[in-house]
Amino acid sequence: MKSLLDLFKQFTPDEHFDAIKIGLASPEKIRSWSFGEVKKPETINYRTFKPERDGLFCAKIFGPIKDYECLCGKYKRLKHRGVICEKCGVEVTQTKVRRERMGHIDLAAPCAHIWFLKSLPSRLGLVLDMTLRDIERVLYFEAYVVTDPGMTPLKKFSIMTEDDYEAKRTEYGDEFEAKMGAEGIKDLLEGIDIDVETERLRGDLTGSEVKVKKNAKRLKLLEAFKKSGIKPGWMVMEVLPVLPPDLRPLVPLDGGRFATSDLNDLYRRVINRNSRLRRLLELKAPEIIARNEKRMLQEAVDSLLDNGRRGKAMTGANKRALKSLADMIKGKSGRFRQNLLGKRVDYSGRSVITVGPYLKLHQCGLPKLMALELFKPFIFAQLEQRGIATTIKAAKKEVESGTPVVWDILEEVIKEHPVMLNRAPTLHRLGIQAFEPILIEGKAIQLHPLVCAAFNADFDGDQMAVHVPLSVEAQMEARTLMLASNNVLFPASGEPSIVPSQDVVLGLYHATRERINGKGEGMIFADIGEVQRALDSDQVELAAKISVRLTEWTKNKDSGEFEPSTSLVETTVGRALMSEILPKGLPFSHMNKALKKKEISKLINASFRKCGLKATVVFADKLLQNGFRLSTHAGISIAIGDMLVPPQKAEIIGRAEAEVKEIEQQYVSGLVTAGERYNKVVDIWGKAGDEVSKVMMAQLAKEKVIDRHGNEVEQESFNAIYMMADSGARGSAAQIRQLAGMRGLMAKPDGSIIETPITANFREGLNVLQYFISTHGARKGLADTALKTANSGYLTRRLVDVTQDLVVNEDDCGTTNGALMRAIVEGGEVIESLRDRVLGRTTAEDVVHPETLAVLLPAGTLLNEDGIDELELQGVDEIKVRTALTCETRYGLCAKCYGRDLGRGGLINLGEAVGVIAAQSIGEPGTQLTMRTFHIGGAASRAAIASSVEAKSNGSISFNSTMRYVSNTKGELVVISRSGEIVISDNGRERERHKVPYGAVLTVRPDQQVKAGLILANWDPLTRPIITEYAGQVRFENVEEGLTVAKQVDEVTGLSTLVVIDPKRRGSAKVVRPQVKLIDANNQEVKIPGTDHSVTIGFQVGALIQVRDGQDVGPGEVLARIPVEGQKTRDITGGLPRVAELFEARTPKDKGTLAEMTGTISFGKETKGKVRMQITDLDGKVWEELVPKEKNILVHEGQVVNKGESIVDGPADPQDILRLLGIEELSRYIVDEVQDVYRLQGVKINDKHIEVIVRQMLRRVVVENTGDSTYIAGEQVERSEILNTNEALQREGKIPATYSNVLLGITKASLSTDSFISAASFQETTRVLTEAAIMGKRDELRGLKENVIVGRLIPAGTGLAYHQARKAKDAMDDAERRAIADAEAAELAGVMADDDTAAVSVAGDASAD
């Protein structure tokens, strides 16, 4: 009976496995899987539809077609379970065994597995140390390979053609053995003695780099074979497994035809060729015929395994390449990505969304019909429980007839049962949120307006999907973790996500504006009720300035109670009435201002930090209700008259046109080049456009009114368009500028700027030419959008893949390392304050007062708003905080190093998947930004070029240590250093610092006192000068026309300038660099003071020479100018690829050079086209590098440089930064560069997220010195693994291995993870699986992705606890288990005894009564 009951139990696979191993299958293993050999190519009988015996669908091998019924029908029903029918040989069992039973084909000749042959690098080639070409010739019967040379001078592994073979046979007879085809290769593989080979290779890791590399690779492979117990011979197959038939189905279509899986065709070909070959061999057919058949068999097996990898793909009847086994698992529609990582979900529906303004934040409107369908099982259960229906069938009928009781039950079932809403594309975790459903009529889902920002949803036809969490656990998680009212902050930046937008903002803004001399101005009210009555009776207007007595609630620090305090406040009617909805504990000053979108965001943020989540959600809902009401009352609309075109516009445009004419004039007379002309014209128009928009906004923003006392004053305008833009409800200055200013410069599709701007605006209307130019930009916007969305999605996918296994898995790793944080200052402006950078991080060491050195905060404190306010008061300007990069946790991160969970506002919880959050935070805006280009209609947005710096604050001037300058003949100071900075400090505290470029003219001196607004330095932004530091007479060297310089005659002007040309372009052999030497009055060469080197100033390619031979020059004079290329428009288009480039750690095109060590620069002998640059350090060690002459060298003879300093101009290579400056500097570089791109678009992302990704890029190390470990020098290993190995070695007193950091790009890092399942499901599936199978890899299932694929809970969030408990349970040995079981039994016995005594005493009590 028990066995019968077990039968109906749900079949659950034992999920107590900790790892999955992949390996090569031996022939014995394949036979052990098989249930019989497939001998015939037949599939099913076309008349009876029964499978043919011994065919590809044979019931005897694979199992019955109908449940518990044999093929001939002799045995039917459950009672014969397990019987094997003697007539048809079919076992009586469930038909689903046809999904798991395999067959096999015995190959008449061995066949090589194509993956190990053709997947690069060829594994067969590595093992045999033969070239792929040779192996292929042997395998496909074009050549012989010597398998046993015997006593002959032939070499084993050598290749010979047919003719050679015949000759050698006649020469040596049967002394040697040579074979063709896979047999030969198999013999060679089986003849390899792995131990001997590894010993030989270990001793041979010397010599040329190529050889060492190759030997190391071979060694690694052979060691893997040895370790995993896989024999190399198994790469050549003798037995081919056959997939279970239900996984390659054959379905009859109507009309007598069949739809079949391609695999059946491929198997059929293999079987046909195999049986033909077997017959030929039995008939002892001539060698040449058998050989051809063997080749064909090899090809058939190849295309079964991976069609199209070698030669032409096999095609079916319709000329379409057949889908082989490899195609089944790889790519977007393969097994991994289609079925394992992305599944379709039951209990789900989708519909259009509409707005539900009356909903609470945690609710959504669910159409009744949809709910009825989704909650069916729950309704059935209720119907049965109440006895309304007796069977499921009856319940179904009841539901379908739609009786009132069904709807009542539905209401009840839905109560407190959250559903999840998802809007595709789900770019971050706020793309799926849970809501409590409210049943509504109609067919559209209703969505709360405040969650639209998080979903990025609007109501122009968007659709959303609904999912029902079924189990109690799922409901609980949805309710506690995913409910919309629990997710009010963006995980990317920690800012509120439930900020109102559009009409709500407009309503709130309009109600909180103040109007000078409004109706009822100056009235004083006793309380808010009085204000409301005055407004209702039309005594005052909303925007009038009044005074009113308000009650504010402040939290008592000690008791935690709220205490009221009353005061008279000057405010406006609207603000006073709005104060009613403020949560307790938020001061009225937060609301006593015009509420723009930014202000509302700050208000909600302040509320969250001060009053907590619940109060904030309620507050946001009230804001929303009021905003809708007020914007309706306001009734703001726009008319064409609101677009005021500034009267100064014509004059500004006239001025610009005059300037452009002047530039054209200069161009015609040859003072500027064509490139400079274009740049200057674009610049003039850019500035003119900005000026027009400035005067336009000034005109829109202010209006003149008469105040109470009859004076004319200015107030902020009540112009509708201005109010919309100013409040942040809709539109921006850029759009208003196009309506009422001028459209300005447009960009071509390639990003270059069209130099004729559109001077008209939409209010005036465009003429045909202007319209035509407009279409350029607009089209670029749309094309961009389409292309970039895909790129951004791919970037997100790579980021998620590289970080998916990073989870917070301990509280504190105990490290004291960290990074120093200070405010980011550029051009004297604080771009990101220290506050923003350290908020929500943990201090790495005590924070001390800068002067008294008193400890303000101990190490390990989480910095929150209050703590930072305190530190800002004390004047702390740098703090060392813990970062994700310096965390010492293995296989994860610790909570302390990560700091605050930005999406929830407290310290991060254990089990939080911070890697995925980081990836989503960086990927999500990428998609956003790329979808946002077309709004401005392609109007060129270009960062105006700086040509000067001005002081932003008062103080005294000092220069940094690298600043060098000379005084020129006019007495101006000219900067001749590359990294000079002007520092303004006040009382010893640095206020600002500005970088000044080479060639700038300084207008201040050291220690000068300056006032804010003073110009400190200016320069020509469009050219880069080459300046002399010394005086003398110019003597050109190698300045020969046609050789190093060319006369550039301008087509327009006929004037000529000398321009330096690339010496590579001409035929002369000796390479010369055009340069200037200076001659003093005595006709001697001027020397660099303190050395005997002559002053030589080289010209770069492209420089325009400004001086003549023999001219006298003074210090600071310009010898030549190099024009700077025209600027492309900078938007995220340049930005997204830039982000991808940084995360892929690509070496930039013309990368700059960093100094390899600290020392003195000197220049050695020049070689062809290159300068030999040398650095000599204090110990006399010399490092040298050849630098191409056209590169801009930033240093000069005799200059002392520090390790890692830039010495040749160009973008830095992250690999160099890591090598020379270390991890912290690298992280700073990547974080800053990525942030620059996003900041340009006004997107806020916390630095943490970028650091998390950099941590993952640095997770592998390169072994340098192997010590006593089994590693090979130069091998890449996971950092955690080498740390574990080294600890084990040190415990045994052996020498640990040393290693150096290596930076991998995100794609590379994803593919080189220890988890082969994760890597295979990412990209290059074939290569990853091939490698893993040969290595016999184990996947420890640490990451999220691997666990999703094998169908377990992920080791993050609530799953982390589950996995830890499971591991702990597995770790308990049997003895402990027994002990616990005994204890429990004893306890149970005790309880029983207790129960007995208790029962007795109860009885006693009863009788005592």
Curated annotation (Swiss-Prot):
Binding positions for Mg(2+) per the UniProt entry: 458, 460, 462
Function summary: DNA-dependent RNA polymerase catalyzes the transcription of DNA into RNA using the four ribonucleoside triphosphates as substrates.
Protein name, per record: DNA-directed RNA polymerase subunit beta'
Entry-linked Gene3D superfamilies: 1.10.132.30, 1.10.150.390, 1.10.1790.20, 1.10.40.90, 2.40.40.20, 2.40.50.100, RNA polymerase II, clamp domain, RNA polymerase Rpb1, domain 3
Gene Ontology CC terms: DNA-directed RNA polymerase complex
Similarity annotation: Belongs to the RNA polymerase beta' chain family.
Species, as recorded: Delftia acidovorans (strain DSM 14801 / SPH-1)
Membrane-traversing stretches: none
Keyword field contains Cell inner membrane: no
Note on how the cofactor is bound: Binds 1 Mg(2+) ion per subunit.
EC number: 2.7.7.6
Catalytic activity field: RNA(n) + a ribonucleoside 5'-triphosphate = RNA(n+1) + diphosphate
Residues engaged in binding Zn(2+) 1: 70, 72, 85, 88
Keyword Cell division attributed: no
A Pfam family this chain is assigned to: RNA_pol_Rpb1_1
Entry keywords, A to Z: DNA-directed RNA polymerase, Magnesium, Metal-binding, Nucleotidyltransferase, Transcription, Transferase, Zinc
Assembly and interaction partners: The RNAP catalytic core consists of 2 alpha, 1 beta, 1 beta' and 1 omega subunit. When a sigma factor is associated with the core the holoenzyme is formed, which can initiate transcription.
Entry binding sites for Zn(2+) 2: 813, 887, 894, 897
InterPro entries: DNA-dir_RpoC_beta_prime (IPR045867), DNA-dir_RpoC_beta_prime_bact (IPR012754), RNA_pol_asu (IPR000722), RNA_pol_N (IPR006592), RNA_pol_Rpb1_1 (IPR007080), RNA_pol_Rpb1_3 (IPR007066), RNA_pol_Rpb1_3_sf (IPR042102), RNA_pol_Rpb1_4 (IPR007083)
The protein's required cofactors: Mg(2+); Zn(2+)
GO annotation terms (biological process): DNA-templated transcription
Matches recorded under NCBIfam families: rpoC_TIGR (TIGR02386)
Domain of life: Bacteria
GO MF term list: DNA binding; DNA-directed RNA polymerase activity; magnesium ion binding; zinc ion binding
Broad enzyme group: transferase
